[in-house]
């Protein structure tokens, strides 16, 4: 047990010296290579241990550490850092997660440093993504419909109307007027000088470089080494010995099972019409939709509190850090998911947040809120990440 604890300690204490030099991290190719080499070396040390002498706790620790180390090596082998883009997220839009209330002067100065680091971050990420495009690893063009909203909204005429300026609109009351004015002036300067030009570069990169070279094929298996990569994702997400075909067959079985349940419900509620009619009813009847963003948030908060009260019945240890229920920021809402959990570090005084997307209310049915809340807040990601 001592030996495996030593390896766990080595993994937890790994320091990326270059990453620590920038508030947004280092995205140079060497960083990913060095980390993969470190994990591969540690994995070999781990595999050399005599597991037959392990007790249950040691075996669990071994399995988990091996799983994490192996995934780090596999991700580098497939160069996943060359493709940090999804239909609802990207290297640039993830910056919005850093926009939080400023609680004191120290946090404000730290946030200003973060904003100043955005140009370097954008340049490094663009370089990596260009490598992915050249290697045929880009995302399919079809997923980028409406994607311009993820960068156009940050190209503002003034600093004050920029989303990244919003934390300075309400500064802590303990700051003096002079301190507040100084911080706001510094924020305006860095947004005009660094943030807005950086997002102009993002716009140019996507519209002049990425979109013209995006692939038309949708499936990742149609990319170079794509079938092997897809299998690696099956291995990671299921932790089972499955194949694409076996998962597809399970999916068909689930579709059949769920469809039967839906048909039973239609009969149970005495709905007059076909399944297509029932689905249309669920998607269009006003009774299932909030009329205002505030109504949707209120409903989500109500469900969250009902889930909170059930936690002690099922979990012995609960997190001390609370979570709030808040709307997805307008800057990213149009291309964002229905909800998301935004965590925070244990050292931070900030709470976690369960974000609810209040954009396009006709696409946000109230009956989806219970499962969304249980997944994103409790007993889902907040409970999981705060312990």
Regions found by a protein language model. Give the residues of each.
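N-terminal maturation segment of proteins
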Residues: 1-387
């Amino acid at each position: 047990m001592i030996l495996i604890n030593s390896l766990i300690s080595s993994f937890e204490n790994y320091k990326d010296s270059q990453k620590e030099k920038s508030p947004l991290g280092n995205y140079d190719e060497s960083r990913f290579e060095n980390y993969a080499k470190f994990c591969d070396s540690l994995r070999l040390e781990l595999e050399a241990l005599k597991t037959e002498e392990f007790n249950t706790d040691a075996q669990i620790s071994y399995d988990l550490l091996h799983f994490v180390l192996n995934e780090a090596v596999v991700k580098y082998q497939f160069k996943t850092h060359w493709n940090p883009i999804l239909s609802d997220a990207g290297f640039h839009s993830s910056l919005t997660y850093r926009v939080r209330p400023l609680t004191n002067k120290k946090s404000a100065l730290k946030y200003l440093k973060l904003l100043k680091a955005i140009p370097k971050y954008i340049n490094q990420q663009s370089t990596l993504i260009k490598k992915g495009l050249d290697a045929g690893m880009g995302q399919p063009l079809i997923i980028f419909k409406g994607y311009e909203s993820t960068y156009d909204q940050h190209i503002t005429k003034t600093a004050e109307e920029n989303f990244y300026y919003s934390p300075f609109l309400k500064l802590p009351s303990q700051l003096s007027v002079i301190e507040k004015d100084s911080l706001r002036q510094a924020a305006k300067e860095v947004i005009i000088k660094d943030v807005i030009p950086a997002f102009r570069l993002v716009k140019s990169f996507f519209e002049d470089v990425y979109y013209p070279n995006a692939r038309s094929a949708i499936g990742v298996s149609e990319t170079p080494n794509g079938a092997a990569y897809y299998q690696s994702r099956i291995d990671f997400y299921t932790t089972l010995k499955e194949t694409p075909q076996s998962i597809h067959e399970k999916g068909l079985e689930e579709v059949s099972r769920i469809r039967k349940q839906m048909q039973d419900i239609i009969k149970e509620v005495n709905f007059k019409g076909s399944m297509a009619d029932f689905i249309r009813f669920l998607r269009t009847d006003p009774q299932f939709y909030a009329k205002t963003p505030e109504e949707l948030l209120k409903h989500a908060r109500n469900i969250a509190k009902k889930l909170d009260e059930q936690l002690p019945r099922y979990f012995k240890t609960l997190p001390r850090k609370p979570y709030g229920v808040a709307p997805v920021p307008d800057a990213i809402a149009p291309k964002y998911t229905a909800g998301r959990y935004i965590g925070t570090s244990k050292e931070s005084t900030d709470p976690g947040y369960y974000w609810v997307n209040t954009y396009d209310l006709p696409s946000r049915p109230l009956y989806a809120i219970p499962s969304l809340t249980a997944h994103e807040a409790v007993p889902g990601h907040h409970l999981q990440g705060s312990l």
